[in-house]
């Protein structure tokens, strides 16, 4: 049984966007505004540096009951005791990640098309990240935008909890939630916001209102 998790407002970090403010400060301000889950995504960091970032984030997040998900790096997630890992289509198979991390780990998987869904082993997966809904500049290999319609189509084929991702801003949140999302994953909408806490509060309010 995985750690409890809430996909409502899911922050995916980008060190390029948090350089001026700092990673820890950005995440702390985002959590103050209502972020419910944090993914550490830093593809440029080597293993040791990534582990140091992860340990610092765990120290910040765990006392607040917010899980830390590591992007791609199952080895780092295991080494630092992070709550979970998020895998892309070209990463380690979810079953292998589950075998390494154990039954309590949260395992997420990116899916952007019906073809990817058909090729995916969802058995060990706890949630699906679906997108990119909009064009995005924060992930070069994200693929073409699928739009709200594409998200809704995949939602109709996936029973697992789903989070929408990809170039999402506050004005997109209501439509994504109404298309069946369990939450919204954002990068620049928070990491590049002048006031991270206020931006998170705005998103969280829209998400909660859209559920009613």
Curated annotation (Swiss-Prot):
Binds 1 Mg(2+) ion per subunit. Mg(2+) binds at residues 72, 91. It comes from the Bacteria. 4-amino-2-methyl-5-(diphosphooxymethyl)pyrimidine binds at residues 39-41, 71, 110, 139. One of its GO terms (cellular component) is cytoplasm. Its EC number is 2.5.1.3. GO terms for biological process: thiamine biosynthetic process; thiamine diphosphate biosynthetic process. The keyword Transferase applies. Pathway: Cofactor biosynthesis; thiamine diphosphate biosynthesis; thiamine phosphate from 4-amino-2-methyl-5-diphosphomethylpyrimidine and 4-methyl-5-(2-phosphoethyl)-thiazole: step 1/1. 2-[(2R,5Z)-2-carboxy-4-methylthiazol-5(2H)-ylidene]ethyl phosphate binds at residues 136-138, 167, 187-188. It is an enzyme of class 2 (transferase). InterPro entries: Aldolase_TIM, ThiamineP_synth_sf, ThiamineP_synth_TenI, TMP_synthase. One of its GO terms (molecular function) is magnesium ion binding. Keywords: Magnesium, Metal-binding, Thiamine biosynthesis, Transferase. Its cofactor is Mg(2+). It catalyses: 2-[(2R,5Z)-2-carboxy-4-methylthiazol-5(2H)-ylidene]ethyl phosphate + 4-amino-2-methyl-5-(diphosphooxymethyl)pyrimidine + 2 H(+) = thiamine phosphate + CO2 + diphosphate; 2-(2-carboxy-4-methylthiazol-5-yl)ethyl phosphate + 4-amino-2-methyl-5-(diphosphooxymethyl)pyrimidine + 2 H(+) = thiamine phosphate + CO2 + diphosphate; 4-methyl-5-(2-phosphooxyethyl)-thiazole + 4-amino-2-methyl-5-(diphosphooxymethyl)pyrimidine + H(+) = thiamine phosphate + diphosphate. HAMAP family: TMP_synthase. Belongs to the thiamine-phosphate synthase family. Condenses 4-methyl-5-(beta-hydroxyethyl)thiazole monophosphate (THZ-P) and 2-methyl-4-amino-5-hydroxymethyl pyrimidine pyrophosphate (HMP-PP) to form thiamine monophosphate (TMP). This is Thiamine-phosphate synthase. The gene is thiE.
